[in-house]
Amino acid sequence: MEFDSVQAEELAIALLEKAQRSGAEAAEVLQSRSHCTGAFFEANRLKELQNSESEGTALRVWRDGRPGIAVAYGPVNPQVLVDRALSLSELNQPETISLNQGTKIAYADDGFAVPVEQLLRWGEEAILQARELYPEVLCTVDCDCELESTLLINSLGLDVRHQDTTFHLAMSVDWVRGDDFLTVSDGLSSREDVQPIAIANQIIQRLDWAQENVEPCTGRVPVLFTSKAADMLWGTLQAALNGKRVLEGSSPWSEYKGSQVTHEAITIYQAPDIGPFSCPFDDEGTSTQHLVFIQDGVLQNFYCDRTTGRLLGQETTGNGFRPGLGSYPTPGLFNWLVKPGERSFMDLIAELEDAIIVDQILGGGAGISGDFSVNVDLGYRVKKGQIIGRVKDTMVAGNVYTALKHLIQLGADAEWNGFCYTPSLIVGGLSVTGRQI
């Protein structure tokens, strides 16, 4: 499917012109449109084919320095949207107008679309692969192809637009044995291709490891977080590196730029041209950039939007994103990459004497404080370099900052988990508690 870019541009220009004629000093229009085609399988059977479209337009204005924002979904009456934004601006305090200047840039389309028949085949292949070895399991698969288009234009001449197509495949398997219930989930997002057999094989491997239930080792023991579970740790660092948190003084790293904050093996960065969540510009029209946050354990940069950067006395890093169309830009991330190590996942396991593997967790993350206590939804015990079975009723507690200073090993098995590209890692300094069988 192709979007009508001419109609979108005409609407954006009309909104800017009407806003300025109505008394706005400056104005900005952000349009977001998406079209999603999907196939949803439940209990091993096709449940439905999905076809959805959405379109939203956000107008941001300043009058007498006061900002106002109004949003419309679907067809838009330009004057009504302008009047609403200007009325809302009267409720806000004056601020420095922060808009990008620029010229018209249309970025190349990323990705390619596939027909619904291909989505059906991917879903069927994943289910057949899982049930070949475990015929008793119930599989749920959600496979879709999403086309997204973004247009950002303002009264200072900025006009940037981008379109991309992304595939998503999420699979979960329910395995019931008497009163023992287990759900294993996996999936991926990609602009290139989907490998349903590989996803199913990942789940099969975890079912193999869960054949036996065993007692967990307890106390302060090494914990191996798989690439699927490691984002729980990285979420805390993402909050600590947020320029707005630094400005507020709530980040524990506010005064540590240039200092060692994690183990020296850890390097974290963002890359605008890598992965399914890459993007050429942020929601303020600033070009995104390659940015190193932590290099060999040393804090290098915080990420910020235009307003936060100005208040911090630095330039924006191109990380001004809106949580929703009706929100103002705030510091945000589009991708997060952790430099992998050199040891395979099985090599990491082989060097563990007695440890826990965490693959899925229940509950929220640690927050910016770093303190956490989570239930292990899916985990395993390692003894003398071998996985001996699944652990149940187990909790892991500790502090993220402490754990990442006590890094034992980074794996080479980096994978995308949402917008986070991370390998597995082994950390110390955490406490494990569990029920004895």
Regions found by a protein language model. Name each.
Residues 103-104, 253-437:
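Dual-mode signal for accessory low-complexity, basic/Gly-rich regions
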